[in-house]
């Protein structure tokens, strides 16, 4: 029976050791572990771990690899001149640990751990750092809208921030949106056929749970033909007393407003005083004061409003009464002579007496 000699055993062991050494020397460096994606707040701390194998003879780098790569470390030496960064190496686990304190918004991005084998051959692993940022509504969002009644309106709202902000639409005073709800979620709010009732202030609200969010006010103007309402279509007043005739006009753009009687346009003079008062939401109150009413001034008056989208008119009838109406005749006295005062006084006394005896 053949038995190996001692010299043969030594030779075999030596060959095995050489084979193992060559095999190990030929092993390609690998990255066995890299920290998973990190999400941090501004001012916080993050640590990236990169574990390597078979890389003792190679250079290991940390880089920030966004548009322009920034070298942070080489081997166990920190390269970046920023006191917020630090680097440690754990030889037991062959792990490089890159730490960033007091995280800033600009620290967000992709970090790469890289083993340099040659100028053309590298082994890399990446980890992404996301930094929570409050929403900021972008300048390319809608600022304001002017549209004709019946046309389509589209409002857009975009915001930066992390996590991605949610965009919610509201109206002033929580009025119902054209979508038939108090709120609408989405970057674009569409009104297929805008009505004058849709005008007003809309709020674009961006929120992602970081800070208090951001808001933009968008003013929507709707162009439409005038609409006139008359609070008191018939008014009575006694002779020689003032009387105010009123009409309310709703229109955009602001209309031209005139008062007429018997197809003759009235103007400010000793008989009439015309005033216009613009209120919010495209309303205008127009008042025609008839000064010391005369017989010929009783009858129909027309309030007419016109803009480039159309026109409207409404009538107000002024009729004669015996007793003065207050307002606007409160405290007003007309003295044309003693005879007039006496006649008026006797007339009023007679009316009051008749009313008393009738009981």
From Swiss-Prot:
Residues linked to a lipid group, GPI-anchor amidated alanine type: 336
Top-level taxon of the source organism: Eukaryota
The keyword Signal is assigned to this record: yes
Glycosylated residue positions: 92, 140
Signal peptide residue numbers: 1-25
Pfam families per record: I-set (PF07679), Ig_3 (PF13927), V-set (PF07686)
Subcellular location, principal: membrane
Function: Required for normal tracheal development and maintenance of the trans-epithelial diffusion barrier. Functions as a homophilic cell-adhesion molecule. May play a role in early neuronal differentiation and axon outgrowth.
Protein known as: Lachesin
The species this protein was found in: Drosophila melanogaster (Fruit fly)
